[in-house]
Amino acid sequence: MQVKLKVLLIGSGGRESAIAFYLRKSVLLSELKVFPGNGGFPDQELLPPDSFQVLDKNSVQSFLKQNPFDLIVVGPEDPLVAGFADWAAELNIPVFGPDSFCAQVEGSKDFAKSLMTEAKIPTAEYKTFSEYSDSLKYLESKSIPIVIKADGLAAGKGVTVATSKEMAQTALKEIFKDKKFGSSGNQVVIEEFMEGQEASIFAISDGDSYFLLPAAQDHKRAFDGDQGPNTGGMGAYCPAPVISESILQKVKEQIFDPMFDLFRKKGHPYRGLLYAGLMISPNGEPKVVEFNCRFGDPETQCVLAMLDGDLLELLYRASTGKIKGIQAAVKKGAAVVVVLAAQGYPDFYEKNIPLNLPETSGQNVHLFHAGTLKKDGKVFSSGGRILGIVAQGADLKSSVDQAYSFLEKIQAPKTFYRKDIGYRAL
């Protein structure tokens, strides 16, 4: 490709820091702007904080009319569910990210489940409720463990795997009565518990063709040994050996093919990234735990470390309907990301922690900012997940060793990280 592209990246997390890192390497990039960004981005890339309201159509379109871009890459789910890609499409600006109809695959768990039922995609049995009393009655007839999910967006924290009836009842009360997730909890999906190993697979689609990125395995629980509450993700590694070639073939034929076909049939070809969170049963059968309409966080940080090619070209081709015949080249070896989080995360956590960050020692270790901000030239924490440390090496063990040896050099009080990322594959 001979084009030069001015790119706008939307988001502020570790995922966006990683995407930006690889976009900057592209020969196609003429200029990168980021909104709202975090404490790790160079000042010259950041748009002013009052540039536009990311969930407001008039504000977004007014800004884009005055500040044209050749491509917009949307990191988080909220703007996509709100309709960001639709608003940009009205101005003929390519967006890497699906329209609001397709984005409901993440915006509503009930919508996602109904699509899976229609397309005969393997997933857990479920029932959706909008009344607290009905959900409690249904619960009485079910065995434990059971999974309780707020229907709408909840930053990865709206799911409870209940190991007792009391725990399930508490989860339902928190969603319906205490409004823990606001309007995202107006409906609740109750589904059967699935046994097996989880894995994440990303598909990049231009609405007609798609290709898969290497599989990753996330670590959602806060503490070592998969203990503690669910989080947005405490670390990941790639590739995930649980996804064999034969399982990958099933994932294509039983999950991605029918899902993309159904979106086309409904008049909404899926453009962007579709993330399948999978459960692989002990006998090697994949089932869908959830779909997301964007790059996963933190999996993106290690998946992109394994890509051997021009990320910007891939995203631009997907956004303009030109990926037929393209495959993502993948490096040999393995990559890992370990998240440094604030004490108390994912509940009430410390903020404004001063961060003393060492230089990344070699080309195989990268430090990606997530919940950080800059004040007077110094970096402080601003979110629950503060940093992601990524290492890529000849094998998973060497990558894990590199990541943890770098983490030990970071001076940040009142923080923690899991010390067993990648344990299932080591």
Swiss-Prot record:
Tell me which cofactor or cofactors this protein depends on.
Answer: Mg(2+); Mn(2+)
Q: Which family does it belong to?
A: Belongs to the GARS family.
Q: How is the cofactor bound?
A: Binds 1 Mg(2+) or Mn(2+) ion per subunit.
User: Whose protein is this, by species?
Assistant: Leptospira interrogans serogroup Icterohaemorrhagiae serovar copenhageni (strain Fiocruz L1-130)
Gene that encodes it: purD
Q: What keyword terms does UniProt attach to this protein?
A: ATP-binding, Ligase, Magnesium, Manganese, Metal-binding, Nucleotide-binding, Purine biosynthesis
Q: Which reaction does it catalyse?
A: 5-phospho-beta-D-ribosylamine + glycine + ATP = N(1)-(5-phospho-beta-D-ribosyl)glycinamide + ADP + phosphate + H(+)
User: Could you tell me the EC number(s) of this protein?
Assistant: 6.3.4.13
- Specify the superkingdom: Bacteria
User: HAMAP family this protein is in?
Assistant: GARS
The residue ranges of the ATP-grasp domain are: 113-320
Enzyme class (EC, first level): ligase
Q: Annotated pathway, please?
A: Purine metabolism; IMP biosynthesis via de novo pathway; N(1)-(5-phospho-D-ribosyl)glycinamide from 5-phospho-alpha-D-ribose 1-diphosphate: step 2/2
Molecular-function GO terms, alphabetical: ATP binding; metal ion binding; phosphoribosylamine-glycine ligase activity
Gene Ontology BP annotations: 'de novo' IMP biosynthetic process; purine nucleobase biosynthetic process
Q: Which InterPro entries match?
A: ATP-grasp (IPR011761), ATP_grasp_subdomain_1 (IPR013815), PreATP-grasp_dom_sf (IPR016185), PRibGlycinamid_synth_ATP-grasp (IPR020561), PRibGlycinamide_synth (IPR000115), PRibGlycinamide_synth_C-dom (IPR020560), PRibGlycinamide_synth_C_sf (IPR037123), PRibGlycinamide_synth_CS (IPR020559)
| Protein name, per record | Phosphoribosylamine--glycine ligase
